Amino acid sequence: MSTVTFVTGNANKLKEVIAILSGSQSEGGESKVGNFTIVNKSLDLDELQGSIEEVTIHKAKSAAEILGGPVLVEDTCLGFTAFNDLPGPYIKWFVKSVGLQGLVDMLYKFEDKSAKAICTFGYCEGPGKPVQLFQGITKGSIVESRGPTNFGWDSIFQPDGFDKTYAELDKEIKNSISHRFRALDKLRDFLVSQ
């Protein structure tokens, strides 16, 4: 059985990834998928400016070099249609700079409040190896903040077909429709086929 290190320091993201990949969490935050055991490590990786794909590839290659083995990284973006998909991969910095209400206010004068949540996982077997990308997209709208505000921008993103934000949805429902679920579903298929 091979070990893959999922590089994240975000405890909420780790719990969600493990729940989606395996449906349960074992001791120490490990998850088994096919012939792989997923373990966690927090690394402070440089994030270059670029597309979500470029950011993810850079993070995966950097993590593989540092850890010397198979790694999994993730990058998430939120793109506003009215802003030609900005803030995109810079959403984390927008949330820190202007807050959730600031993001909502950015769309105040725009009729189009639609947005896309995009999650991209990058898998790299080790130093010098190519990076495989797995991307999931969920369409929705930006709304006034509703629900808990402890997980990024979940409280302002309402997926199409639902009357609740990600933050208000039951975890099992969110984990069956989210951009992260869609990307992980592709990743799981890849890992099981190896």
Swiss-Prot record:
The protein's annotated catalytic reaction(s) are: ITP + H2O = IMP + diphosphate + H(+); dITP + H2O = dIMP + diphosphate + H(+); XTP + H2O = XMP + diphosphate + H(+)
- Top enzyme class, one word, equals hydrolase
What cofactor is this protein dependent on?
Mg(2+); Mn(2+)
- Chief location category: cytoplasm
Q: Which UniProt keywords apply?
A: Cytoplasm, Hydrolase, Magnesium, Manganese, Metal-binding, Nucleotide metabolism, Nucleotide-binding, Nucleus
Q: Which GO terms describe its molecular function?
A: dITP diphosphatase activity; ITP diphosphatase activity; metal ion binding; nucleotide binding; XTP diphosphatase activity
- InterPro entries assigned to the protein according to its UniProt record, in alphabetical order: ITPase, ITPase-like_fam, RdgB/HAM1
Segment forming the signal sequence: none
Entry EC no(s): 3.6.1.66
Annotated positions binding ITP: 8-13, 59, 75-76, 92, 151-154, 174, 179-180
Kindly list the positions annotated as binding Mg(2+).
Answer: E47
Q: What is stated as this protein's family in its record? A: Belongs to the HAM1 NTPase family.
| HAMAP family (UniProt xref) | HAM1_NTPase
Protein name, UniProt field = Inosine triphosphate pyrophosphatase
* Organism expressing this protein natively: Scheffersomyces stipitis (strain ATCC 58785 / CBS 6054 / NBRC 10063 / NRRL Y-11545)
- What gene makes this protein? HAM1
